[in-house]
């Protein structure tokens, strides 16, 4: 299931069509929210499998797979599009996180919020950024990912943007974000 990539120390597990029936297949399982956590924990406890980070990319909808990912995680990195309905969606996500913390995963926390699809020519992007920074303050990363045509094109070519065009503004922003994230991680690690 795990696939090596062209990047050293980066493995991936891709989604597949079999996951679409998961909700129906597990309908009678009272512990279904813990299926991913159980499997992931068992896999990671094998000493031959050492990973610094496990990232789970979730769809914006609140499906069983998303709940499983939230139950399996210790922290969240929330991408927030700087668009009209994004803050409303974030409010819903916050309510969901609180419910999951109460009943399924008390250790879940938001690591940070990454503003994406930012268009400096658009007043709405600036307004969403301001509201996010006012409300979530230090949780919002300094780096902002701009709206960029190369970011949109890369998936249609079956490539991450960092391979498709590592010099485009979107790629440069993701590199900056990675630096910011890792610097934050080293600060958290040294404070522990």
Task: Kindly label every feature range from the protein language model.
Residues 35, 92, 173:
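Charged catalytic carboxylate motif
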Residues 1-49, 104, 154-157:
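P-loop/Walker-type NTP enzyme "switch/lid" segment
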Residues 45-149:
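Conserved catalytic-core segment of NTP-binding enzymes
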Residues 15, 38, 143, 147, ...:
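Active-site donor-binding loop signature of nucleotide-sugar glycosyltransferases
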Residues 176-188:
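C-terminal alpha-helix
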Residues 29, 86-89, 170:
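Short, conserved glycine- and acidic-residue-centered signature motifs
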Residues 155-176:
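C-terminal boundary of histidine-terminating zinc-finger modules
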